[in-house]
Amino acid sequence: MNLRQQITQFLTLAYVFSSAFMLWKTLSVIANSHSPIVVVLSGSMEPAFQRGDILFLWNRENRQKVGDIVVYEIDGKSIPIVHRVLREHHNNEKQLLLTKGDNNAVDDLSLYAKKQQYLNQKEDLVGTVKGYLPFIGYVTILISENVYFKYGMLGLLGLSALFSNE
């Protein structure tokens, strides 16, 4: 492979990655969420959502209602949680929410940060679920949980890049 072909391959790869990044940032701005698409990682929301479902989020509502399915993050924890709003309170123009997984026996109070009794709608929520695609996100779960699958995928990608004729 000559230098021109290598540069073309590199630029094509850079174009693909930059296009994906721009699409992600565009979705983030439209949905008003730093993470407009998330994958369900546990069975706590069954039967509504299964592990591996991809959720599409929207964070432009000023208020959530009891029964809405929201995604939130807790300080000190990196994985967002998908649960349903169980109760809401208002405190000095702030909407405070208590959530619970559909498949859980108790509310999420034990999941919240220390001394936190409710979620602050403006600070803790990533977004409200507006749509989903079943099981498509399972690939990301396999990649993160199975080392052999991850390295197998990387190996296949490397081999395809190495042996491509374009």
Curated annotation (Swiss-Prot):
Any keyword Transmembrane helix? yes
Q: List the subcellular locations.
A: Endoplasmic reticulum membrane
Q: What catalytic reaction does the record list?
A: Cleavage of hydrophobic, N-terminal signal or leader sequences from secreted and periplasmic proteins
Q: Which GO terms describe its molecular function?
A: serine-type endopeptidase activity
**Positions of the catalytic residues:** S44, H83, D108
User: Which PROSITE patterns has this protein been placed in?
Assistant: SPASE_I_1, SPASE_I_3
> What segment(s) does the record annotate as region C-terminal short (CTS) helix?
152-163
Query: Where are the membrane-spanning stretches?
Result: 10-30
Which Enzyme Commission number(s) are listed? 3.4.21.89
Q: Which UniProt keywords apply?
A: Endoplasmic reticulum, Hydrolase, Membrane, Protease, Signal-anchor, Transmembrane, Transmembrane helix
Q: Which residues lie on this side of the membrane: Cytoplasmic?
A: 1-9
Cross-referenced CDD domains? S26_SPase_I
Description of how the protein assembles with itself and partners: Component of the signal peptidase complex (SPC) composed of a catalytic subunit SEC11 and three accessory subunits SPC1, SPC2 and SPC3. The complex induces a local thinning of the ER membrane which is used to measure the length of the signal peptide (SP) h-region of protein substrates. This ensures the selectivity of the complex towards h-regions shorter than 18-20 amino acids. SPC associates with the translocon complex.
Share the domain note from the entry: The C-terminal short (CTS) helix is essential for catalytic activity. It may be accommodated as a transmembrane helix in the thinned membrane environment of the complex, similarly to the signal peptide in the complex substrates.
Provide the function of this protein: Catalytic component of the signal peptidase complex (SPC) which catalyzes the cleavage of N-terminal signal sequences from nascent proteins as they are translocated into the lumen of the endoplasmic reticulum. Specifically cleaves N-terminal signal peptides that contain a hydrophobic alpha-helix (h-region) shorter than 18-20 amino acids.
| Protein family according to the UniProt entry | Belongs to the peptidase S26B family.
Please give the name of this protein: Signal peptidase complex catalytic subunit SEC11
Task: Please name the source species.
Answer: Candida tropicalis (strain ATCC MYA-3404 / T1)
Q: Which gene encodes it?
A: SEC11
